[in-house]
Amino acid sequence: IFAALLTAAVAETFACTNLIVGKNASTDGSTIVSYSADSYGLFGELYHYPAATYPKGTMMDIHEWDTGKYLGQIEQARQTYNVIGNMNEFQVTIGETTFGGRPELVDTLGIIDYGSLIYVGLQRSRTAREAIKVMTELVQEYGYYSSGESFTIADPNEIWIMEMIGQG
């Protein structure tokens, strides 16, 4: 009976896994983060966003990460950093795990979803703390479109967990 219940629970789970090791827990003082999308059908893809300089006033289209739905535009940063996968040129890395939440808490007018928040955050940050600042400022200005997420945000010196859910 236990195995059947466990199988049923796992079959309906759409989650991600982050393993986090801080500097004081690793033998060589490294921070270590791994991230995987555990949901069936979400296979690893390696995205590349090259570093760039943009004229003041340039706008950036935001599309929902999971569906491609157009959500709106945000102001582009004047300078962005090179991002490959979920890490940028300064070794800032961001992963996530979805915890969902009540549907009425999703901001249907928000422009920033969890996936866009990860990659825009990586393009604009030199440290984990700066990524947290960038991410929170983006959702304060443009609204947060997704359900509940737990973000793992790391750099070579520290690792943070930031949870976010919409206000409805």
Where do the PLM segments sit?
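Second-shell loop/turn segments in exported
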Residues: V106-T108, S116-S125
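A contiguous strand-loop segment
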Residues: C16-Y114, V134-G168
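Sec-dependent signal peptide recognition
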Residues: I1-A4
